[in-house]
Amino acid sequence: MSINWILLIIGGLFETGFAVSLGKAQHTSGKEQWWWLAAFAISVSLSMYLLFKAMGGDKAIPVGTAYAVWGAIGAIGTVIAGIILFKEPVTFWRMFFLSTLVISVIGLQIVSSK
């Protein structure tokens, strides 16, 4: 796995961070809300920067693949965080479609490596 893929995965995790930060900010007020909004700003900045870096250099990931994988990692992480942190429901169909995202990310990584 190249450094670009590692950067992309970390960027996707920061995408989860900015989505969770927004969710937490919605459920707080005052000074605590501002801390969550600051976490959002930092997370979104790092996420976008790492996505940008993953698409450059000698081992550049194609933009379409990078964006799809980045978004999927963020979506998967956000669903898992929502279940754990916000007590969102765990249903068969939710887990089924989440697993299709995981399979798609793996497939994109495989075909982009060739």
Indicate residue ranges for each PLM-predicted region:
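Polytopic alpha-helical membrane proteins, predominantly small-molecule transporters/carriers
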Residues: M1-K114
